[in-house]
Amino acid sequence: MKKTLADFNFFYSAFSLATNYVTRCHYRNIVERGSENIPWGEHFIIAPCHQNALMDPMLILQSFHSYKNPVVFLARADIFRKPAIRAILTWLRISPVYRIRDGRDQLGRNEEIFNTAREVVEKGVPLCLMAEGRHNDKHQLLPLVKGMFRIAGATQVELGDKPLYILPVGIDYDEYEKPMSSAVINCGKPIDIRAFVDMYKENPPVALNQMRDALTPALKGLMHHVDSTEHYDEEFAYCHLMTQATLEKLDLDNDTWGRFQARRHISLQMAQLTEEEREKCYAEGAAFADECRRKGVPLWFASKNLSSVQVGWTFVILVAFVALLSVSHLWGKWLISNLMVYLPTHLIPKYKIKDPQFRSSVNYGIRLVSQFLYTLVVAIIFFITQGFLAGLMISVFSILSARFMPLLFARLRDVYYYFRMII
């Protein structure tokens, strides 16, 4: 019997353990909130905002990982054009969705795709669709596409009295392009589709609009949504300028979650200001952004208010690490060879990928492949030249280095930014 996307796949589940680890290694910090809202054991569709190309689904996989029922995704069809890529994506439990830009003759194929998606949800497997249909390079929610709501309405009809939920998920990043930023995954209250099923049976277009109207504010409340389009850059910069003051005002911790809450609060407050007051905020934000650009410091770092004590401890950690390696000829070789992984993951996206939105995703893909090959090759070399124990130890250290080496480089980057700010 042919397996479907909803069926259990042992090899995929084992592979996902590796990808989830690499996802953790890709970020300095991943903050998850609202996990109590996930309706495990029920039928549900995950509806995240789409902020950062491939990294959004990788964060969803990491946060919603279930060994028995990994998440199934729907993605735009244009990435499935090459047969080899299509085979890989299908194995990764990703199915295509066709849009008008793919050709009107292709739209008819969505009926089969939507039927498959409905079967996935009916079997109790989480289904994920990016609510906006395309990623955005700004902290703004784009208009939601209706494909998800068509699947939800038809599935709820099939389920009858059994509930189907749409789970809104907000995603936020300190920085889109580079690795070792911090990420926030914020799950909201699930939306019960039974509330719309009667209208769906009577007038589907109206029901689809009602579902969209329910999901849109839910998502905006879970992410940092900058409402202004014309003055986006100024408002976004102002949110970072006022982060520390807002942390003190709201008695929030100066950490990833606290700063995210502060920035979101500032945007909500700005929406209530008069036009004259907002213009003043925009001017302050523009001046702050100009100052950061002049010093070569990103907004997210400028808003952290890193202290000299933290910088001092970073120096201590770096010196201790180098000293530890210097007393061991074996680990010195390991450190040098580790650059074989670190350098390609940073240089190739920076100089070869023109679209900034895909640089982090390409970095992730290179890291996933190169780290596996590096660990395998180095383990074999050390096993042959140094013996079994050395080969085993270097394998373990290589896997661990995938996590703490980027953290060390990120700390070093913090020190660099700190001195750029005070000079």
Predicted regions and their residues:
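Long, charge-rich alpha-helical interaction segments
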Residues: 213, 217-303
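Soluble catalytic domains of membrane acyltransferases
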Residues: 5-19, 23-206, 215, 321, ...
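Membrane-proximal, non-transmembrane alpha-helical segments
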Residues: 270-349
